[in-house]
Amino acid sequence: MEEHMVTKLKQTDNYFPHFLLLFIVFQPILDLLTSFSIYVLHMSATVGIVVRFAFMLLALGYLLLHHKQQGAKKYILYLCLFGIVLAIGLVNNLMIKSPVSFGEEVKFIMKSVYPIVLLFGYIIALKELKNNEFAFHKIITYFLYATLILSISIIAAMATGTDFPSYPNSKIGSRGWFFAGNDLSSIFAIMFPIVVLYSFHKTTSFSKVYYWIPTVLAMYASIMIGTKVGYGAIVITLGIALFFLFIEYMTHRKKEGKGFTYLVNTIVAAIVLGGLLVLTPQTPIAKNMSIHLQIYEYKKSVQDEKDRKEGKVVKEEEHKQGELTDSEMKSLIYSDRDKFLKVYKQYYKEAPLSQKLFGMGYAGNYTTKMKLVEMDFHDLFFAFGIVGFLMYLLPLLYFGIKIFIRLITNFKKLFSVKHMLLASTLVLSLGIGFMSGHVLTAPAVSIFFVVILAYLIVDLEIE
C-alpha cells in the first residue's frame, strides 16, 4: 500500500511540469470565464482570480517539494525574505493609512508576487523535464493554441455583434467577449513573437505558407482592440523577424535546403509587414490617435480658458505645422498616465519615512477613489517602497544580467531568429510594463512573460 502511494506520488510529480506548461492554454478560457462571472453572474471574486491564485500555491508547493534541486533553496530563501518585507509594509499601512482596504491591499500583493512565484516554479519544472527541445516545442504549441482561442473568439464576437467596446468614449476598438482591453492587448503583444516563431518554424516552403495564418489572425485581432501596445508590438516583432531572417538567409544561402527556408520566411514576413504598413491609416489605432489628440486639445482649451478667467498666465507651447508639441506627444505615448504619476509623486513626498521605505500600498495614500498609475514599475515602487521595490527587482535584475552576458559571450551561436524573438518577448513585456502597465501586476498577462523567461534561463543554462 505504502509503495503504491509512493509510486502514485512520483507519477504525479512527473506529470506536474507538463501540467504547468498546459496551464498556458487555459489562460484565455479563464479570461472568458472572468467576463462571464462579472457580466452575467455579477461576481467580484472571479473564477480567473481564484484559479490563478490556486495555481500559484501549487507552483509554490512544487518548488518546496523540490527544495533539493539546484537553485531551489536560494529561491525559497528569497521568497521568505520578500514575504517579510511585504508583511512589514502591509502591517504599517493598516496602522497608518486611512482610508485602507485590507482586501485590496492583499489582492494587489498576491497579483504582484504571482509572476515571481511562477518564475521559480517554471524554472524547476523545466529542469525536471531535462529536454529543452521538447519543452520549446510544447511552449510554442501551447502559445499558439492560446492565441488562436483569443483571436477566433474576438473575431466571432465582432462578427455576431456581441462584442464589448475597448473604450468608454468615442475611440474605436473591440475587446471581444473579454473584460479587460488593456490586459488583452498586452497578452497579444507578448505572445505575438512566439506565434511568429511558430509560423517560421513550420514554414519550410511556399506550399506551407498557410502556417502564417495564425500570425495574421493574431495581428487582425490585436489591431482591432485599438490600442497602441498591440500595434507597436506587431511592427517591432515583424521588423526583428524580418531583419534576422534575412541575416540567416545570407548566412545559410549556400547550404542545401536551409537557405531556401529562410528566403521563404523572409519574403512572407516582408509581405505581411508591408501590408500592415499600407493598411495602417485604416486601422483603429490611427483613428484613435486622431480622436485622442482632439479630446486632449479640447480639454486643454477648456483648462486654459479657466486659467485665464482666474488671472493665471497661460504658457503657449511652440507648435510647428504638422508637428506635435511635447505635451501632445506625452499624452499620446502615456495616455495621460503621466498626470496620475504627478499625483502619486505628491503622495510619496507627503508620506512618512516608514511608507517611503516599505510602500504606501495599493493606490497610494488616496482620499476617495482608488486609482493606479498603470505603469507597473511606478505602481510597484509606490506600493512597496524603496526596500520592497528593490527586493522585487532582484530576481529580474539577476536573471536579466545573466541572460545578457550569455547572449553577448555566445553571440554567434545565439544570433538566431529563435533567440532574438524569445528575447524580444522579454523586452516587449518589460517595455509594456514600464510604459502602459498590465504586465507584472496582471496575472492573466505575467504568466506568458514568466514562461519565456524561465525557458531562456534553463535553455541558456543560466541556472
Locate each region found by the language model:
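Hydrophobic, aromatic-rich transmembrane alpha-helices
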Residues: E2-K10, P17-L22, F55-K68, M191-H201, ...
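Loop-to-helix entry and N-terminal half of a specific, functionally important transmembrane alpha helix
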Residues: L20-I24, I401-M435
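Aromatic-anchored transmembrane helix interface
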Residues: G48-A54, L79-A87, P99-K127
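Interfacial loop-to-transmembrane-helix boundary motif in multi-pass membrane proteins
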Residues: K74-F82, Y122-I155
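Alpha-helical transmembrane segments of multi-pass inner-membrane proteins
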Residues: H137-F164, G181-M250
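Long extracytoplasmic/lumenal interhelical loops at the membrane interface
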Residues: F164, R175, F179, L324-V387, ...
